[in-house]
Amino acid sequence: MLLFWLSLAVGAIGSAAITLSCGLVGAWYDFYIPVLLFFGFAFACVALAFLFAFILSLFSDKKKPVDRQNRLYAFVFHTINAYLIFMSRAKVKVIGLDKLDKAQNYLIICNHLSRFDPMIIENRVKNKPLAFASKPGNFRIPIVGGVIHKCGYVSINRENDREALKTILHVCKMVENTGMSYGIFPEGTRNTEPQKGLLPFRAGALKIAQRCGIPIAVFVTRNTNSIHKRFPFRSTKVELELLEVIDAETVKTTSTVDLAKRAKDEMESALYGKVIDRQTE
């Protein structure tokens, strides 16, 4: 976010300096010259951030596990996220963050409507460094894959229990050593028909909280799936709400199936005003 505002400041100063030094102000249409220069400078600074991310991705070996979040990669990634949220014209209302203990790390779970969901959560939940469990395909995206790997993102192999456990233990090691929080979407994929209710939850995803001995923070997002439909001509009001925190002791003594049902019921009550009868996987 700092880089974004810095880019605007540089754009403003640069456009004003060029306008004054060249004596460009004269006719009414000359007003647009500093405006164009302003956005030109801002765009150039953001383009440099993307170029920097590309260069950083060249030094990311995705086959080599990371033991902590790289601050430089995280800074660049979060700055670009903040810029994309701003440019999408998403107006984010955050509710209930006061329920989080700033000294505590969490497993953050949320419904999944849009690609903007993890971006908004990362941008607004700032008490601890945060990474997500992501699908394998995201690590194959040019630039993005290398950067998120260095940010501590992991891919959980749901088809291989042994590999999944290995990844969960690795996550717990990072949580213990660095105090990170982790986010996961228990629906497993984006819900393209949210009007029908939440998708079945993958209860195994909550094993991260049990193995790591951390609380579960239950969030919901609202209307993030409308952002791409309204962009660029209309802004979109979206919400990120923290519904409840399931304490570590309850997480430890409750089965993942029961935890998943509790979280899913809580989310559906908040989103639809009722619990929708669907299975938990």
Task: Please identify what each model-predicted range represents.
Residues 2-105:
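Membrane-anchoring hydrophobic helices of lipid-metabolizing enzymes
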Residues 8, 165-281:
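Non-catalytic C-terminal accessory region of glycerolipid acyltransferases
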Residues 57-78, 86-87, 102-161:
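Catalytic core of membrane glycerolipid acyltransferases/transacylases, capturing the structured
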Residues 79-80, 92-96, 118-119, 168-171, ...:
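A generic local structural motif
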Residues 87-89, 127, 148-150, 177, ...:
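Short, well-ordered coil/turn elements that cap or connect secondary structure elements
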Residues 94, 108, 132, 240-242:
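Generic preference for hydrophobic
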Residues 94-95, 154-157, 248:
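Short acidic-hydrophobic, aromatic-tinged amphipathic segments that line or gate anion-handling sites
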